[in-house]
Amino acid sequence: MEGNETANLCSKSVGWLQKQDKDVEPWLWKLSNCFSTLTQSLPSAGGNPKDYMEHPKPKVELKDVPPPPPPVKPCKNIFPTVPLPKIQPPALPAVQHQTGPKVSCCVLCSNSTSCAPEIRCSGGGYIHPNTILDTGTVTCQVAPGLSFAPESPFKKASSTSTFVPRSAGFSNLCLENRLSPCQCHSQPAPCYSKVHLNPFHGDHPRFQVPALGTSPSYFTSGLSQHVENHLAQSEYLSHYCTSSLHFNTPSSAFLKGPHFCNVCFEKPSSSKVTDSHKIWPNIPPPNTSSAPIPICNGCGTQETVKEAALILAKNLCKASQKYGSPDLATGQMQENLPPIGVFWDIENCSVPSGRSAVTVVKRIRERLFKGHREAEFICVCDISKENKEVIEELNNCQVTVAHINATAKNAADDKLRQSLRRFADTHTSPATVVLVSTDVNFALELSDLRHRHSFHIILIHKNQASEALLHHAHELIHFEEFISDLPPRLPIKMQQCQTLLYVYNLPTNRDAKSISNRLRRLSDNCGGKVMSISGTSAILRFANQESAERAQKRMENEDVFGNRITVSFTPRNKEVNETKNSCVSNEKAKSPKKVNKNTKLCLSIKDDSSSNTKAASKSACGSVSKNSNVKSLKELCQMQSKSNKTSQQEKDKKRNGDKQGTLSQSSPLCTNQMLQTARNVGTDNTASKSFQKRDDTTRKSNADSQKEQKNKEDVVFQISNPSAFSKLTESRQASPFCSSQSGWSSRSLSPSLSNCSSPIATNQTGAADNSVDPFANGADIQIGNLDYRMSRKELQQTLHDIFSRHGKIKNVELSPHTDYQLKATVQMENLQEAICAVNSLHRYKIGSKRIQVSLATGATNKSLSLLSFGTVSILQDAPACCLPLFKFTEIYEKKFGHKLIVSDLYRLTDTVTIRDQGNGRLVCLLPSVQARQSPMGSSQSHDGSSANCSPVVFEELEYHEPICRRHCSNRKFSGHDFDPDSYIIPFVIISLKTFAPQVHSLLQTHEGTVPLLSFPDCYAAEFSALKEVQEGQGGVPLEHLITCIPGVNIAFAQNGIKVVKWIHNKPPPPNSDPWLLRSKSPVGNPQLIQFSREVIDLLKNQPSCIMPVTKFIPTYHHHFAKQCRVSDYGYSKLLELLEAVPHVLQILGMGSKRLLTLTHRAQVKRFTQDLLKLLKSQASKQVIVREFSQAYHWCFSRDWNVTEYGVCDLVDIVSEIPDTTICVSQQDGESVISIPKRERTPEEVERTKQFSKEVVDLLRHQPHFRMPFNKFIPSYHHHFGRQCKLTYYGFTKLLDLFEAIPDVLQVLECGEEKILALTEMERIKALASQLVKLLRSQKDSSINMPDLLTEYSKTFGYSLRLHDYDVSSVPALMQKLCHVVKIMDTDLGKQIQLINRKSLRSLTAQLLILLMSWDESSSLTVEQLCQVYQSVHGIPLNPCEYGFVSLAELLKSLPYLVEVHTNDLCEDSVQLTSLYVFAKNVRSLLHTYHYQQIFLHEFPNAYSKYVGEVLQPKQYGYSSLEEILGAIPQVVWIKGHGHKRIVVLKNDMKVCHQMDKELLCLTSPMDLLCGPVPSCLPSPQLHPDPVVTQPADLIQFEEHFHFSDLVYPEETQYNPLCNGTQPCNFPTSADLDTFSEPSTQNICPQESKSTKELPESPVKRQHRNRVKLAANFSFAPVTKL
C-alpha cells in the first residue's frame, strides 16, 4: 500500500488487491488505493454493446447489481445544508477512451447547469463544487454493508426533468442514460458521500437501488436488462459509515466498493465483518493502462500526488455528535463474535496481597479475549472477608462480584457452578469458558461444557491442581506464572489541599448562626465548611481548588439576608493570607515508613486581586501542544478544537499579562507529583515548569508540552510533610498540645525551613478552626445496648433505616462483636438532625433490647483529648510504657488532681490498650504512639523496640566499637573485615544466681556498655573463663542468658554492633521489680497476637526451643499445615515479621546463622503453666525438688531438661514465679514446691455452688456451650450485671475457681488458648432443654428426624455438632436424650417427639418418706435408694420417666429436700437437708400423738422432750416457730386461729399400718403406757373371720417380717402410695448388702377394706381404741366399744 505514487490518484492496477500487507488490516486502505482502471470489458446482456456516449467521456461499468429491496420509510432531514466557499475549479483535460471503458467521476459539480444536477443525501447537505480543501494523510476505514434479497424488483420512478424527484431523507444517484453496458469495477469509491456522475437524460425511467440499505437511489431504465443479468447477489455489498456519531447521516449510492459518510468523509470503522476475499472479488488486472480519473472538487484536486484529507467544519461535527447513535457495524461485529465467559474463584486463586486486581483482569482480557466478545466476567467471594481494595478494583473493572456467605460449605463453588450452567443455557457453541480455580469440584461442569456443549475450556489453575480437573480443559495456564510480575497496588491519590475562600459584605443585623447556616447551604454542594464569621466577612474551607472555584462561581453576588456578597480567594489582610493560605493534608498520620512517600510541597503565590486568580488557575490547567502527524480524522478534530482552546487561553493570558505585570495564584497547586520549582535569586524573572495532568483520552497523541515564561512573582514554600522530619510533624499534628512543646525544634527542622513555614503553626490554625464548630464535619451518635443476638449486617441495615428517617447519614459503624458489648456509631451530616434522632430513637426497641442513644459532643472529645495527652505523658515515663491499672489510676489522679474514669480509657483505642494479665489489668501505650512521641523517630532502650519491632533495639548510640580494645584477645580485629556469618553463638553453662551480679559488675567497670563480640574475653579477664559447650550438650546461648538478667539488655548501635548495656543506662535499684526492668513487650494487633502464640507453639516443640531462621518457613508449614504469608501481617520480609513479636521471640547471632528462641518472659510463663499442671496432677498438690524430674516425666511423658526453658538451673526459673502462684518451702530438709492453699469458709463454698449454676446459665447462651477463657469476665458482667469477684468465692485466680467446679465446667487447652466448656452431662442437659423448646414450637410437638439439624440451626443460629456428644448420628444422640424425646415410626418416616413425663410431686413424697424412714445414721447411696424404692413399691425407679437422665440429677433438682454428695469412692450419696431432718423429727413426734396433731403452743416443749434439745428456729434460718413449720409444707400444716392453732401431720406422712416399726422402736423419754392409746391401733376383732380351710394362727403373730408380706392399700388419684398408707418396715443396710434384685412375684398385696372407714383427715372425729395391743393384727373393720 506504500507503492510509488503517480500523477493521477487512480492510476494503479487492481493487482494490489491480491497482495495485502501483513502489517495492515485488510479493511484499512489509503485513499490513493481507492481508484484503478479496468481494461477488461464484459459482454452485455444483449450480446452487442451499445454506445450511449455522445462524446468521449469516462464510462462507468456496472456489474452484478442485484434487485433492490422494497423502499423504506424516508428519514427526516437531520443536518442542515452547510455551504462551503466556492473556489474556481481548474481546467480539466478531456479523458481519452482507449481500449476499454474507463471509470471517472464527474468533472464539475455545478448547480447552475442542467447537466450537472445536485446529488443530495438524506441529510440535505449541499456540497458545492470547486472547493479545495487541505491535504494530509487520512486513514480511511472501509467495512462491508448488508446484503439484500435478490428477488426484490426494481422500482421505477418517473423522471420528467434532469433532477431526480425525491422526498427528504433519500439518497439519490444520477447516472447518465447513455452508459456503456460494461462492468463496474469493485474498487472503493472516493471518500465523498455524494458521488456525482454524468447527468441523466429524460428519456429513460429510473430504477431505485439501495445505497445504505435505508435510502434508495435511482438508475435509468436502460440498465434494466444489464442489471438483471449481470449483477450477482453475493457480490452486491452495501457500504456505510460506521461512525456512531454519524449514524443518522445518509450517504450516497455506490455500486461496488465502500460507501462514505457525508459528514466526516471517513470510511467505515476498522471492524471486520466478513472476509476480505468476499468483499473484493479476485479480478484479474487490466492489460491496458488506465486513463487518469479526475476527482470532483468535493474530494480533492486534480493532478495531486498526496492523498486528500477532507476535514469538515467543526460545527458540522458537533451537530453529528448531538444526534449520534450506536455503531451498527460494531454492534453487528460484536454479535457475530463468539462469546467468552470468565468465572473466577477468587478465594481459591486470590490476588496476591498488595498487588493490583486491575492488572489481573486486564491480563485476562488482553490475552484471552481476542476474537471474542465478553459475555460474562464474574468472581465469587465473601466481600466481608475479601480485601476492600480488591473488591473496589474489581467493580471498577466492570467485573461482577457475587457475594456469598463464607461460613456456608462450598458456597462459592455452588455459585460458580450455577453461573457456568446458566452460561451454557444462554450461549451456544462456539463459545469459550475461562475458569480461574483449582478446585476439583468444577470437573463435572467442565466435562459437560466441553463434551456436551462443545465449548472451548481455558483453565487458569495453581500448581497443586488435580488431574481430574486438568483433563477437561483445552488450554492450561498456571496462575502463579500468570500473576508472577504483577505490579504493586500503589494508588496515586491526589492529596487534597484545603483551600480557603473569603466572603465579604455579610449583613451585621443577623446572628452568626443564621449567616453560617445560609453560607453552608450555599456552599454545601461543593463541600464547603464555614470556619469562622467575623463582622461582615467569613472564611470557608474546601477540600481542593476545584471545589473552591465552583463555589466561588455559585456564591458570587448571592443574596444573604438582603446583602449581595462578594467571594474571593484572597483576604483583604495580607498577613491573614500568609497564615491561612497553607495546604494542610487531610490524611491521617501514617507510619514513619510511609510518610516520606507522601511528602508534598504546596506552592503559594501572593496576589492582590481576585480577578486574576481565576485566569491564573485556568492557565495552569494545561499547556499548549504541538500538532504532529495526525493519523485519523477524529484526532484531527480533537486537535483542532484543542488548539483553538489553547490559543484562546494564550490570548487571555497575554491580555491579562499586559494589563497586570504578575500572575496570581492564591490557592496552593496540589498535584500527585512533587512540584519542581526553580528560584533564581537576584534576577527579576523566575522560570518554572508547569505541570499538566495526564489526560487518558489523548494518550495516543504525541504532544510536547511547551514552557511558559512567567513574570516576576513571589514564591513562598510551605512544607506540609517534610520528608526528613516526617515523624516529628506527624507526632505533633496528632498531639492536641503540640503548641506548648517546642523543645524539639532544634532536632527537627533547620532554621531556614522552620522560619519559612512551621508545621506547628499550621496545626494550631487547624485546631483553632475546629474549635469554632465541633460539629462542622457532622455529628456522631453513640448507640449502646444493642442486641448481640442479631447479625451485624442486619443491625447495620436496621440502624441505617431508622436513622435515615431523621436526616442524611454519612456512615454507620459497628464496634467489634465481643463480650456482648456491641456498640454502634452513626455519623450524621447535620447537628439538628442528629439531635432530633437522639430525642426520637432513645430507648427504641431493636430486636429484643431497647437501644441507648446519645450524642457525642465536642466537650466529650475535648475531655478525651486531655485524657489522651495525660495518659501518654504518664506511660512514656513508665518502664516498658506499661503500668498496672491501679498504679496508673493513682499516678493520674495525683498528677492532674481529678478522678479518672476507667471506662474512658477504653475509648482511647488509638492511644492505649488495656490487657488482662495475671491478677490485674495492664495499661500499655500503643507502639504507633510511642514512635510518634520519640524525638528522633527511633525508640530508646528503655522504650523497647517500637520502631523496628525487635527485642534487640536500635539505640541512639551513633557509633560503638565492635570489640573491647582492652580485653579482646584478637588485637588485629578489624570491623571492616569482620564477616557476620563467621560469628558462632557460644553456648555456656552457668547459673543466673552467679552470673547476674557478675554481669552488673562487668558493666560497672566498662562504663555501662560491653560489645557482645568481646563479652567472653571481658568476662574471662574480670572473673574466669565461661564454660562453653557445643549446641545440644546442656548449654544455653550466652546472648539469651544475658537478657535473662533483670536490668540488662542487648541493643543495636547505629553501626549494627550488638552491645550489652543497662536498660536505663544505670544500675537498677536494689528493691526494684525485676519484671519492670526487662525489655518492653509491645502491644500488637490481633493478627500478631495470634502469630506470637503460633511461634510459642512452634518453638516449644524444637530441641532446646532453638531453631535456625532459615528453617522457620518449612517448619511452620509442616507444623501448622499452612503457609506463613508475611504479607498477611502487613510486612514484606520474614525478618520484619519475626521482629514484630519481641515479647515472645528473640533473634540470636548475626548474619545468616541467626537462631530463633523464646524470650525469657515467654519461657517463664510457659514453665509456670507446666509447673501448675504438674502440681495439680499430684495427689498432695506438691512435689519435692529431688523428685521433680521423675514427676515431670510422669506428667508430660518426656524427660526433664532445664535448658528447654532457657536456663541452666531449676532454681533460676522457679525464683521468677511469684509467691502467689507457687510456694517453695523446706520440709524435713527437702525443698518442696507446692500450690498455696487457703481454707475456704462455708459461705464461700455455698457461693461457689451458686457460681456453678451461674456458669451453666451463662454458657447455655453461648454457641456450642463453650466460650474463650478471656471472654468470661466481660460476658459475666454483661449477663448478670455485676462483677465476678474472685475473693467472694475464696480464690485469687479465675482458673482456680473454675477448677473448683469440675462437675459442671471443664477448661480445654487449644494451644495457647483456653476454652471453657460444659461437661458432657451439662451439655446433654442443656441440649435437652433446647430440644424441648424446639419441639414445642413445632406442629404436634414433633419433627422429622432428617429435619432436626436444619431446624436446630435456624432456631439457635449455629449448627448441632454431633461429635461434641461423642456420637456420629442423630439416632445415637436421641438415645442419650431418651429422658426428653422418643423416636416414633410414622407414615412420614421417623419422627422425634417429646415424652410424657410423670408427675414429680408424687415421686417426691415417696422419696421423702423413704428417706425419713431410714433408721440408720449413715447416708444412703443412690444405688441403695433405688433398691429400697423397688423393694417397697415393686417397680424400678426410672428417672427418664420424670425427665432426668439419672437419679442423681433428679435428686439434685430437689435441693431444698435432699443433698447429694460424692464420696471418696466416687459414689453419690443422698441425705436429707438440715431442715428436713427437723421435719423428720416433727413427723416422728406427731406419730406419738392421737390424730397426729398437737397444739402449736405445746409444740416447743413436746419437741424438746422428744428430741432432747431446745428448738431454735434461727439455727435453720427462720425467725419464729410458725415460719419454720411453714417451710415444710410437705410434712405438716397449721390449722385454726389464735391460741387454738394446731399442728397437723399431712396424710401423706401418716403411718397407716399396724406393723409400724417406728412405734415398736420408739426411743422417746415419755412413758407410753401412761399416754393415750394411739389411734393407729385397731379395735379388737369381736367378729371372727370365716373358718379357714388350712390351720393358721388367728392372732397372726410373726417373728420375722419380709417385704413380700407387707400389705399395701389401693392407690388413689392423688397419691400412688395408697391414700396415705405407707409401709413402715424397711430394710437395714445389712439387709441391702445381701439383698439382690427383688422379684415382683413375691409381692402379694392383700386386699384392704374400704378406704372410707379409714381416717383421712385429722378434722374428722374418730373413736378411740380402748385396747392397746403391742402385736400386729390383720386389717379389720373398726368397731365401737
Swiss-Prot record:
Q: Which GO terms describe its biological process?
A: meiotic cell cycle; oogenesis; regulation of gene expression
The task this protein performs is described as: Essential regulator of oogenesis required for female meiotic progression to repress transposable elements and preventing their mobilization, which is essential for the germline integrity.
Bilayer-crossing regions = none
Q: Where in the cell is it found?
A: Peroxisome
- Residues in coiled coil: none
Q: Where is the RRM domain?
A: 779-858
- Organism the protein comes from: Xenopus tropicalis (Western clawed frog)
What range(s) does the HTH OST-type domain occupy? 863-937, 991-1067, 1087-1161, 1163-1238, 1247-1321, 1323-1398, 1399-1472, 1474-1548
- For the NYN domain, which residue ranges apply? 340-477
Q: Composition bias, kind Basic and acidic residues: at what positions?
A: 648-658, 692-715, 1649-1659
GO cellular component labels: peroxisome
Q: Which PANTHER family match?
A: LIMKAIN B LKAP (PTHR14379), MEIOSIS REGULATOR AND MRNA STABILITY FACTOR 1 (PTHR14379:SF3)
Q: Which GO terms describe its molecular function?
A: RNA binding; RNA nuclease activity
Pfam families given in the database record: MARF1_LOTUS, NYN, OST-HTH, RRM_1, RRM_MARF1
Region annotation (Disordered) maps to 576-595, 638-717, 1637-1662
The answer to whether the entry has keyword Lipid biosynthesis is no
Record's compositionally biased regions (Polar residues): 638-647, 659-690, 1637-1648
InterPro entries the record matches: LOTUS-like, Marf1, MARF1_LOTUS, MARF1_RRM1, MARF1_RRM2, Nucleotide-bd_a/b_plait_sf, NYN, OST-HTH/LOTUS_dom
Q: What is its main location?
A: other
Q: What is this protein called?
A: Meiosis regulator and mRNA stability factor 1
Q: Does the keyword Cell cycle apply?
A: no
The UniProt keyword set, sorted, is: Differentiation, Meiosis, Oogenesis, Peroxisome, Repeat, RNA-binding
